[in-house]
Amino acid sequence: MEKQVRVRYAPSPTGHLHIGNARTALFNYLFARHQDGKFIIRIEDTDVKRNVAGGEESQLKYLKWLGMDWDEGVDVGGKYGPYRQTERLDIYKELYEDLLERGLAYKCYMTEEELEAEREGQIARGETPRYAGNHRNLTEEQIAQFEAEGRVPSIRFRVPDNREYKFNDIVKGDVTFHSNDFGDFVIVKKDGIPTYNFAVAVDDHLMEITHVLRGDDHISNTPKQMMIYEAFGWDTPQFGHMTLIVNESRKKLSKRDESIIQFIEQYEALGYLPEAIFNFIALLGWSPVGEEEIFSKDEFIKMFDAARLSKSPALFDSQKLKWMNNQYMKKQDLDTVVALSLPHLVKAGRVSEDLSEQEAAWVRDVIALYHEQMSYGAEIVELSEMFFKDHVDFEEEGKEVLKGEQVPEVLRAFAVELEALEEVEPATIKKAIKAVQKETGHKGKNLFMPIRVATTGQTHGPELPNAIALLGKEKVLKRIQKVIG
C-alpha cells in the first residue's frame, strides 16, 4: 500500500510572508490536497538572532488570508509535534550524540578567525572555499588542549569520500552531486543549536514527510540532507526544486527589489483580493492544460499536477497581477468593492471617517463608477481624483481637444442647459447634451469630448452623465467657466 502523501511548508520567522514563500506554501498545499494528503506547517526558528517579532504570526495569518488551511502545525497540533524547531532540541541532541558515538560526526574547535583565514587562503589560490578537515582526526591530547583554552566546539558531519548522491527531482529530473565537492559541514553550532540541514533532515524523517517541494536555492542542501538520511539508515523523501521567480529584468526576485511589492500583507493593505493573489501565485512556475488563466481554489486542487511545474524561471509580471485582480474585482458586489476602496479615500484625506448617510451614498456612487475599471482598492484614490479637486489639470491630449473651434459654442450651450436643470441626474444630463447637439449641430466627438475634458479634465473616463451628476452643478459650471473665460 502506498504511503499517504505528507508535505510541509517550513518557514523561518526571519521575516513576513512574501511572494516566494507563499508560492512554496501554495504548491505544497495544492500537491497535498490534490492527492488527499496532509499539509503540515513547521516553524524553523533555530536561527534565533535573525528571527523577527511578528514573523511567525505574519506567516500563519497571511497563509490563511490566501485561503490555505493545514492539517498539522504549531497552531493546530498533531501527533508528530512539536512543530517548532526550538521545542525539538532534545530530539536533535539524542541523534547528533549518536553520530558522535559512531564516529560519523566530530567536534571542531576552530575559531571563526581560523576558519576565515582558511577560506581567504583558498580563494587566493583560486580554490572553491570549503572546510579542509583540519580537526577531522584530532588526538585526545589536542582535544584536551583546546578544551583547556576554553574553546567551544561546533559539531561537523564527516562527509564520506568519493561518493555520488543521485536523486530524481520532480522538476529537474536526474540530479547528481559528488561528496568530494563538499567539506565536512556543521550540524550543531557552538551555541548547541542544530543547523538547518541537520534539523530539517531529522524533522522530515520523524514527521514522515514523503515529498519535499521547495525553491531552487535549496538544491545544494539536498545532498547534505541525503548524507544525514543515509547515516541513520532512513529512506529519503522525493525532492522537487521549483525554479526561481524573476522580475521583468530577468533578475532573481530579491526582497530588496523595491520595484515589486513582495509581501502578502502589502497586497491586503492595498485592497487586493486573496482569491486573485492565490490564482496569480499558482501560475508562477506552474501551468494548467489550455489557455484559461482564471481558476478557483477548488479547480486548482482538482487539476494540480506536479509534472507541469516549469523548468524555466517564473516571471513576476505586476501588470498581469493587476489585470487578474481586476477580473476578480468585476465579479464582486459593490459592497465588497466599497469596503476595499473607502479606507483608502479616508487615508488620503479625501473623505471623513465619519460620513453622514448622504455623504456615504455619494462616495458609494463615485466608487461604483470605477467598479469595472479598478484593479485594486487603493487605486480609487488616483482614479477618482477629479471628484475631490476644485480645479482640473488638463493632459496634453485634453488641451488639444479644447483648441477646437466649436468648443466655446458647445460649452456655453451646455452651461445654459445645466444651469436650467432642477434635478441634476444622469438622465437629465443626457437630455441636456442632446439639447446642445440640436442647438449647435455638433455631434459625436466634437460634442462629447469638449464637455468631458472641460468637466473632468480627462479624455477617457467613466460614463459622462454619471460623472457630471456626481460632480454637481456648481463644480461643473465653475470648471466650464474657467475654460471659456
Swiss-Prot record:
* Signal sequence segment: none
Q: 'HIGH' region: where is this motif?
A: 11-21
Stored SUPFAM superfamilies: An anticodon-binding domain of class I aminoacyl-tRNA synthetases, Nucleotidylyl transferase
Q: Which GO terms describe its molecular function?
A: ATP binding; glutamate-tRNA ligase activity; tRNA binding; zinc ion binding
The keyword 4Fe-4S is assigned to this record: no
Binding locations of ATP: 255
Q: What is its EC number?
A: 6.1.1.17
Question: Nucleotide-binding: is it a keyword of this entry?
Answer: yes
Q: What does this protein do?
A: Catalyzes the attachment of glutamate to tRNA(Glu) in a two-step reaction: glutamate is first activated by ATP to form Glu-AMP and then transferred to the acceptor end of tRNA(Glu).
Record's subunit section: Monomer.
Q: What is this protein called?
A: Glutamate--tRNA ligase
> What is the scientific name of the source organism?
Bacillus cytotoxicus (strain DSM 22905 / CIP 110041 / 391-98 / NVH 391-98)
Q: Which gene encodes it?
A: gltX
